[in-house]
From Swiss-Prot:
Species for this entry: Corynebacterium diphtheriae (strain ATCC 700971 / NCTC 13129 / Biotype gravis)
Residues annotated to bind Mg(2+): E181
Pfam families noted in UniProt: TetR_N
Occurrences of domain HTH tetR-type (ranges): 10-70
Protein name: HTH-type transcriptional repressor AcnR
Source taxonomy: Bacteria, Bacillati, Actinomycetota, Actinomycetes, Mycobacteriales
Length: 190
């Protein structure tokens, strides 16, 4: 049996994740059967499940990757900027449909919910850290607790993702994001 380098294994794992993301986006979690995953990924079930023990772990790996990527952008630019980028460049955000699947599974699968909370914490921490940093710099309104602003922004994000992923009208979303940003910012110049 040939020896496979860690680099090669990592590349194969990434190929599986990219194919699985397309499959989950097109068919949803339930519709992404092992056969469909094999076809979309272009690898056998043995190859897929060598890297991921089951479909749920594969899906969670995607969710973890998405949360980490979003957390990076949030830490740098803020959650409203993430939403602006999603609106301007939907092709860069192939994970939108995956996020809707996550929402559905959170409601229906307690085991998944418990495992997902760990991954979501990465994004939550990035958003909270950014809000706290901006509050410290006097950029955030100070009449509302940071945790309330965090919940508010998360709620807006969930609705925003739902609208984009379901093909809803986006005509006024740029102005909505302006309104959201104005609603959390301090009225005093920093």
């Amino acid at each position: 049996m040939p020896v496979v380098s860690n680099t090669e294994l990592s590349m194969r794992r990434q190929e599986i994740l990219e194919g699985a993301r397309r499959c989950f986006a097109e068919h949803g979690y339930e519709g992404a059967t092992v056969r469909r995953l094999e076809e979309t990924v272009g690898k056998s079930r043995g190859a897929i499940f060598h890297h991921f023990s089951d479909k749920e772990n594969l899906f969670l790996a995607l969710a973890r990757e998405d949360a980490a990527r979003m957390a990076e952008v949030v830490a740098e630019n803020g959650l409203v900027e993430v939403m602006r980028d999603m609106l301007a460049h939907p092709e860069r955000h192939d994970w939108l449909a995956t996020r809707l699947e996550i929402t559905k599974m959170l409601r229906t699968d307690p085991s998944f919910r418990n495992r997902w909370i760990e991954h979501q914490r990465v994004l939550d921490d990035a958003v909270l850290e950014r809000l706290q940093r901006n509050a410290h710099l006097g950029r955030m309104r100070d009449d509302v607790p940071i945790d309330v602003l965090h919940t508010y922004l998360e709620t807006v994000l969930d609705g925003f993702i739902s609208r984009l992923a379901s093909g809803g009208d986006t005509d006024n979303l740029e102005r909505v994001l302006d309104l959201v940003e104005e609603s959390v910012r301090s009225s005093q110049p920093s």
